[in-house]
Design a protein with these regions (language model features):
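Mobile, glycine- and charge-enriched loop segments
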Residues: 48, 53, 67, 96-123, ...
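Glycine-/Pro-rich loop/turn segments that contact NAD(P) or position catalytic residues
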Residues: 116, 121-219
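A conserved pocket-lining segment of Rossmann-fold NAD(P)-dependent short-chain dehydrogenase/reductase
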Residues: 215-245
C-alpha cells in the first residue's frame, strides 16, 4: 500500500566549469568566482529512506539546488524540502515494486538511503540487501538514468565483518551488486561512509554523536599525525582511529552524484573521498 501526494515540478540546476581565456584565468581564481549554473532542466529526484537521518538532509540539499524532490519512506511522512511524500513498505516486495515504479516515473535519479542496523542478521540482510534490490530493480524498470546509494566504507567490513553484523555487510554487498548489475559505471555513485555524525542528539542504535562532539572528534582524528598512525596501524586500531564523517558531507556527496557531478567517479569510499566529492557542489 502507498499514498501519493502530487509532485510539483521545479527546475534543477547542474553545474559545469566555466571556460576562460588563458590570460584571464589567474584573475578569475583570485576573485574566487562561484561556479556557473548551467544545463537547467526540470529534474525530479526520488529519495528512498527520505525521512531518515541521512535521507532528510539529502532532500533538503536537493531542494536547495532547485530539484523537485519526492521522499519515499515506510511511513510516508512529509519531509522538509520534498514536494511530495510517498509511503511504501519495502518488506512487501511485490506491492513495493509497483508502488516504486509509479513513484520513480519521470525521475532523473533515485537516491537510496535505505539501511537497517542493530537487529539480527536476517533482518539486517533483508533491510540492507533485499529492500535495496527491490529499489534498484524498480528504478531500472522505470527508466531512471542515475542511481546513488549510501553503503558502508570498505574498511569497516574488512575489520569487523566476520565478527559482528554479518547480515548488515552481506546486505550492503547485495545492494552494491544489484546496482552494478543494473546500471553502468557512469550511471551510479556508491557513497561509502564509516561513522556518520551530526544532529543534536546522541544515539546508541544506530550509534551516533552530535555535530558539536563529532566536529571536535573529526578535528583530532583528521589531523596529520593521527592519520599517519592510522595508515600504519592494524585493522581494528585503524578503524578506531578513522576520521568520522559529517552527515552534511554525506548528503552533499549524494546530491553531487544525483546531479551527475561525478567526473567519472562511481565509488566514493571513506571520509576523505566523501568530503572531496561533496565539494563538487
Amino acid at each position: 500500500m502507498f499514498t501519493a501526494v502530487s509532485v510539483s515540478t521545479r527546475g534543477c540546476a547542474t553545474t559545469r566549469p566555466i571556460s576562460l581565456a588563458r590570460g584571464a584565468r589567474s584573475n578569475a581564481r583570485a576573485r574566487a568566482a562561484p561556479r556557473a549554473m548551467a544545463n537547467v532542466d526540470e529534474q525530479k529526484v526520488v529519495v528512498v529512506g527520505g525521512s531518515g537521518f541521512v535521507g532528510s538532509r539529502v532532500c533538503a540539499r536537493l531542494r536547495e539546488r532547485g530539484c523537485a524532490v519526492t521522499s519515499v519512506s515506510k511511513s510516508g511522512a512529509s519531509v522538509e524540502g520534498a514536494s511530495s511524500a510517498i509511503g511504501v513498505d519495502l518488506a512487501d516486495a511485490a506491492s513495493a515494486r509497483d508502488a516504486l515504479r509509479d513513484a520513480f516515473a519521470g525521475a532523473e535519479c533515485v537516491v537510496s538511503c535505505v539501511g537497517v542496523i542493530g537487529t539480527d542478521d536476517a533482518k539486517m540482510r533483508a533491510g540492507n540487501g533485499d529492500y535495496n534490490v527491490v529499489v534498484v530493480e524498480a528504478a531500472k524498470a522505470a527508466g531512471v538514468r542515475r542511481f546513488v546509494y549510501v553503503s558502508v566504507a570498505s574498511v569497516v567490513p574488512d575489520v569487523v565483518g566476520g565478527v559482528a553484523m554479518k547480515g548488515y555487510f552481506e546486505g550492503k554487498t547485495m545492494a552494491e551488486d544489484a546496482i552494478r548489475a543494473n546500471f553502468d559505471a557512469n550511471e551510479y555513485v556508491i557513497v561509502k561512509p564509516s561513522f556518520i555524525y551530526g544532529g543534536d542528539a546522541f544515539s546508541l542504535t544506530p550509534p551516533r554523536v552530535t555535530k558539536t562532539y563529532g566536529d571536535a572528534l573529526a578535528k583530532v582524528l583528521g589531523s596529520g599525525p593521527v592519520k599517519a598512525l592510522a595508515a600504519k596501524a592494524p585493522g581494528p586500531i585503524a578503524l578506531t582511529l578513522a576520521e568520522p564523517v559529517s552527515v552534511d558531507d554525506v548528503a552533499g556527496a549524494c546530491v553531487a552524484g544525483a546531479l551527475g557531478m561525478t567526473d567519472g567517479e562511481s565509488v566514493v569510499d571513506g571520509t576523505d573521498e566523501i568530503k572531496a566529492f561533496a565539494k563538487k557542489l
